């Protein structure tokens, strides 16, 4: 794939899809009480205002897939790249933007684990989409 515009649109689109699937996983986890069952107070309402920025940021994080590392093992690549948004969520968004403490611990002691799992969903979905699209 030599077309740079196609590369950019593929990784952005894959990241957006990952963001959508991640968001649905977070929402379903809250709706079905899974988050509450593990003591994590994350149960968002599914709305365009909540969903749209998550999809866009998923697309932006998708640009990590332009990096030429771990392409042979796409699932590992997705998991490794999911650490980027995970670290930002735990050390920037929760403490500085949402006022939920470092790593979101005000939301429950297992919040960091939940964030790792939900962002792994993003990374794996984006990686699978790129594999299916024959990007790699």
Regions found by a protein language model. Name each.
Residues 1-136:
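Juxtamembrane/disordered regions of integral membrane proteins
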